[in-house]
């Protein structure tokens, strides 16, 4: 009996891990927004670690957003003087 229970448990874990890798765990919120601790909608996507809601997007797009936000912050500091 214990062996069957262990087998069922292992099978359940394998199925859950497989579905997570395939991107079946949905994003939270709408329009691709996701929590930084959630899997993205697509297995090729990542969650950008930026101010505000984490956005599910491609890794390259995260880098572009970081550069744009960095420039915006520089302009704000310059014009505040």
Swiss-Prot record:
Subcellular location: Secreted
Keywords: Amidation, Cleavage on pair of basic residues, Disulfide bond, Secreted, Signal, Toxin
UniProt main location, coarse: secreted
Record-annotated disulphide pairs: 27-41, 34-48, 40-56, 47-62
Residue positions where Leucine amide is found in the record: 69
One GO cellular component term noted in the UniProt record for this chain: extracellular region
Propeptide cleavage-removed residue intervals: 73-81
Signal peptide: 1-23
Tissue expression from the record: Expressed by the venom duct.
GO MF annotation list: toxin activity
Domain free text: The cysteine framework is XI (C-C-CC-CC-C-C).
Family: Belongs to the conotoxin I2 superfamily.
Name of the protein this chain belongs to: Conotoxin Eb11.3
């Amino acid at each position: 009996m214990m062996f069957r229970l262990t087998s069922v448990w292992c099978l359940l874990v394998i199925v859950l891990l497989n579905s997570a890798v395939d991107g079946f765990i949905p994003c939270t919120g709408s329009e691709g927004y996701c929590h930084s601790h959630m899997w993205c909608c697509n297995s090729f996507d990542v969650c950008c670690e930026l101010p505000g809601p984490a956005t599910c997007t491609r890794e390259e797009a995260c880098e572009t957003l970081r550069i744009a936000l960095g420039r915006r912050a520089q302009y704000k500091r310059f014009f505040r003087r």
